[in-house]
C-alpha cells in the first residue's frame, strides 16, 4: 500500500495515496484499503472543540480507520489518560500504529477487533461512532459501553432513509414511518435521536442531546448517557412523539400517536411521520461554552465555517418548533415570488434562520403569523 502524508489540524498522518486507487480519473475514499475522507474535516474540527470541553479520561474511537479522529482529539483537544483506537481491518490497525507513533502518542491502545465485540468488553467516558453509513448497528453496544454521564457521539451519513426518500429503509433501520416533508433535514436528525433513545431504553439507559447538527451529507450528534429505568421512561413519555404536516396548506406540528390527523387550518389529512424526538437539539449551557471557546481554535481550516454555524445555531436553539421551509410553504400557498428570508424575519420579529436549510426560518409564533408575513411581502 502506497502512502501519502497529509496534515489535518495539528497532526500529520499517513493515508493511502488517492492516485493509486483512482478509477477513470475519479476517487472515492471507500476504494482505498483504509478509509480516509478529507471531506469530513469539518466534522472532525467541530468534534475537536467539543472534546476539548468534555476532557474525558478515556476516549474510544471504535471505527478508527487511519486513526485521524482519535489522534486529533489527543493532540488538539485533551491529552486523555487513555486513548483507545480500533478497527477490524488489520491493514487499518497497522496504519494506526504508524500514525500514533508519528504523532508522539505513547499511551494509545490499539485494537484490531469488530467494533461491537470490543464495545462489549470495555467501558469508556467518551465513545465515538463514525461509520460509513448508518450508526444503528452500533447503538446498543456503544450506549452500553458508555459510563454513567459519559458521552457517546454518532455520525450518520445514510440520509436517504432519515430524510424520507427511502421509506422502507427507514422503517427497517430506524423503526419509523417517514415521508419526504418540507422540514425533512431536521426531522431526519430527530428520527435518529428517537431511535437511539428507544434502543438505550432497552438497557435501562437514556440519552439527551448535548450538541447536534446537519452538514453536507451527514448528521452529527453528541449525547449524554444517563442510567436508570425511570429516567428512560420519563424521556420516552416526554420527548417521543410524531410529526404531522398538511400537504395542502403546509401547517405542521408535533402530534401524539393517537391524535386526530386532520389539519386544524384546512381540514386536510396530515402526513404523519415518527416516532421521533421532539426535545431540544442542544444543551444550552454547553452550547454557550462552545461559543465562548471556539475562537481558541482559529488555526482550524474550517474555522470560518464553524463560526457561521455556531452563530446560526445560537440564535435558532431557543425555539422549540421545527423550522418552516419558506420556499416550500410559498409553493403550497401558490405564492410565486418568495420573499427574502431577512424580510420575513423582520416581519415576524421573534424568529431566526436555521442551519438546516437556507430558505428555512425558526420561530415559535403561530402558522397564521408566518403566512401573514409571507403573503404581505410577496
Swiss-Prot record:
Span of domain Trm1 methyltransferase: 4-374
Binding site for S-adenosyl-L-methionine: 44, 69, 87, 114-115
Sequence intervals crossing the membrane: none
Keyword Transmembrane helix set for record: no
Entry's EC annotation: 2.1.1.216
Entry annotated with the keyword Signal: no
SUPFAM superfamilies recorded: S-adenosyl-L-methionine-dependent methyltransferases
Protein name: tRNA (guanine(26)-N(2))-dimethyltransferase
Organism: Saccharolobus islandicus (strain Y.G.57.14 / Yellowstone #1)
Lineage start: Archaea, Thermoproteota, Thermoprotei, Sulfolobales, Sulfolobaceae
Amino acid at each position: 500500500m502506497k502512502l501519502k502524508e497529509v496534515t489535518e489540524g495539528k497532526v500529520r498522518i499517513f493515508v493511502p495515496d488517492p492516485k493509486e486507487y483512482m478509477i477513470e480519473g475519479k476517487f472515492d475514499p471507500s476504494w482505498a484499503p483504509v478509509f480516509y475522507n478529507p471531506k469530513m474535516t469539518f466534522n472532525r474540527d467541530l468534534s475537536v472543540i467539543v472534546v476539548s470541553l468534555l476532557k474525558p479520561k478515556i476516549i474510544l474511537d471504535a471505527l478508527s480507520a487511519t486513526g485521524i479522529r482519535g489522534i486529533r482529539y489527543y493532540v488538539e483537544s485533551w491529552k486523555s489518560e487513555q486513548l483507545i483506537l480500533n478497527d477490524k481491518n488489520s491493514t487499518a490497525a497497522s496504519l494506526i500504529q504508524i500514525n500514533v507513533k508519528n504523532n508522539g502518542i505513547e499511551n494509545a491502545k490499539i485494537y484490531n477487533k469488530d467494533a461491537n465485540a470490543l464495545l462489549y468488553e470495555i467501558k469508556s467516558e467518551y465513545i465515538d461512532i463514525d461509520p460509513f453509513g448508518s450508526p444503528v448497528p452500533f447503538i446498543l453496544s456503544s450506549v452500553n459501553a458508555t459510563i454513567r454521564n459519559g458521552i457517546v457521539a454518532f455520525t450518520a451519513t445514510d440520509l436517504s432513509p432519515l430524510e424520507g426518500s427511502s421509506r422502507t429503509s427507514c422503517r427497517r433501520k430506524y423503526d419509523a414511518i417517514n415521508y419526504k416533508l418540507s422540514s425533512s433535514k431536521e426531522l431526519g436528525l430527530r428520527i435518529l435521536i428517537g431511535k437511539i433513545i428507544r434502543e438505550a431504553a432497552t438497557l435501562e439507559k437514556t440519552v439527551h442531546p448535548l450538541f447536534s447538527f446537519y452538514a453536507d451529507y451527514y448528521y452529527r450528534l453528541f449525547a449524554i448517557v444517563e442510567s436508570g429505568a425511570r429516567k428512560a421512561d420519563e424521556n420516552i413519555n416526554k420527548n417521543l412523539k410524531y410529526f404531522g404536516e398538511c400537504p395542502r396548506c403546509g401547517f405542521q406540528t408535533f402530534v401524539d400517536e393517537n391524535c386526530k390527523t386532520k389539519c386544524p387550518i384546512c381540514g386536510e389529512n396530515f402526513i404523519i411521520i415518527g416516532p421521533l424526538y421532539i426535545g431540544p437539539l442542544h444543551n444550552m449551557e454547553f452550547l454557550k461554552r462552545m461559543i465562548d471557546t471556539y475562537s481558541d481554535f482559529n488555526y482550524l481550516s474550517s474555522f470560518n465555517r464553524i463560526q457561521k454555524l455556531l452563530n446560526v445555531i445560537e440564535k435558532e436553539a431557543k425555539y422549540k418548533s421545527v423550522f418552516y421551509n419558506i420556499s416550500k410553504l410559498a409553493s403550497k400557498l401558490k405564492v410565486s415570488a418568495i420573499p427574502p428570508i431577512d424580510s420575513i424575519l423582520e416581519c415576524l420579529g421573534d424568529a431566526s434562520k436555521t442551519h438546516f436549510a437556507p430558505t428555512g426560518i425558526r420561530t415559535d409564533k403561530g402558522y397564521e403569523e408566518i403566512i401573514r408575513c409571507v403573503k404581505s411581502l410577496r
